[in-house]
Amino acid sequence: MEKYEAVRDIGSGNFGVARLMRNRETRELVAVKCIERGHRIDENVYREIINHRSLRHPNIIRFKEVILTPTHLMIVMEFAAGGELFDRICDRGRFSEDEARYFFQQLICGVSYCHHMQICHRDLKLENVLLDGSPAPRLKICDFGYSKSSVLHSRPKSAVGTPAYIAPEVLSRREYDGKLADVWSCGVTLYVMLVGAYPFEDQDDPKNIRKTIQRIMSVQYKIPDYVHISAECKQLIARIFVNNPLRRITMKEIKSHPWFLKNLPRELTETAQAMYYRRDNSVPSFSDQTSEEIMKIVQEARTMPKSSRTGYWSDAGSDEEEKEEEERPEENEEEEEDEYDKRVKEVHASGELRMSSLRI
């Protein structure tokens, strides 16, 4: 990692550690996801890297490169200095209608571009929406670990996403249109920005996953009396929260909805956005690595050299994790089961959900 120097840790998760780093030559700050080599380099990692690399849009975090160290695979991305949209809402309680629209317009433009590129995100939520550090923050979609490409992958049928944001058809465990499920998740994000709470949680029992799922399936929500929003806004939300995805408003229809078009920034108009939709997208690529080079690096990362268990990045793991890796039996072929299926099963069983933290 001679190219970058560590600044500080900025997050962690099941994948490992996210670090803020600085390019030694250009002094540019970047975000680096550090994933331990070995079994953690799974299909989700492949999917995240390949799908993310193909996207070039101002409302999507820029993918830069992947680097292999003796102990970790490093995914280098644009750093968003403004942090998560989730934290901004937690600090403010909720947004005004105009501010919520400002961020929703950017979210829709970013997701619409993903859909144009035949990629559905499948895990849209406030924690996966970042902001840059400008006075009028630019929204940036991140984390494509659960994304799916209709070009590279089959149509999704597995349940995936954070429970509060999951569309009814996803919970049905049947084949569904990932793009329409993304529209639902965008609607949840809009609701939370306006209300400061999740639309389908039981106010008296917000951590009860089963109740949340029941309310999602029956589309049971309401706008509280203390939240004053326009009739057009309420109508848009109602058109998003439709149980039958075939009757749900589409991304194209959202972009022509009167509420969406009000005060639409010039750079988000159809004319300005057209450049990102051309086959010869003139937006410069932020990665010099070819897909073949990237996949070769990722494939190599699936092995953990025994001679390289310690070193510069060893603090991102632990001795116990290393012991686990050594004792781990060969993975069963049943790993073919989609990771998303496992995730929803766990959610149903555990009842864990980060929902109450937004309550006012």
Swiss-Prot record:
Induction text: By hyperosmotic stress and abscisic acid (ABA) in leaf blades.
Ranges annotated as biased composition (Acidic residues): 317-339
Post-translational modification as stated in the protein's UniProt record: May be phosphorylated.
Keyword set, alphabetical order: Abscisic acid signaling pathway, ATP-binding, Kinase, Nucleotide-binding, Phosphoprotein, Serine/threonine-protein kinase, Stress response, Transferase
Basic and acidic residues bias (residue ranges): 340-351
Catalysis: reaction(s): L-seryl-[protein] + ATP = O-phospho-L-seryl-[protein] + ADP + H(+); L-threonyl-[protein] + ATP = O-phospho-L-threonyl-[protein] + ADP + H(+)
Keyword Kinase: yes
Annotated catalytic residues: 123
GO MF annotation: an example: ATP binding
Activity modulation: Activated by hyperosmotic stress.
A Pfam family this chain is assigned to: Pkinase
Tissue specificity remark: Expressed in leaf blades, leaf sheaths and roots. Expressed in shoots and roots of young seedlings.
GO annotation, biological process: abscisic acid-activated signaling pathway
Catalytic class of the enzyme: transferase
Record-annotated Protein kinase domain positions: 4-260
Protein origin, superkingdom: Eukaryota
Its EC number(s): 2.7.11.1
Gene Ontology CC: cytoplasm; nucleus
UniProt-annotated binding residues for ATP: 10-18, 33
Family stated for the protein in its record: Belongs to the protein kinase superfamily. Ser/Thr protein kinase family.
Function (record text): May play a role in signal transduction of hyperosmotic response.
Protein's recorded name: Serine/threonine-protein kinase SAPK4
Organism field: Oryza sativa subsp. japonica
Upper taxonomic lineage: Eukaryota, Viridiplantae, Streptophyta, Embryophyta, Tracheophyta
Gene: SAPK4
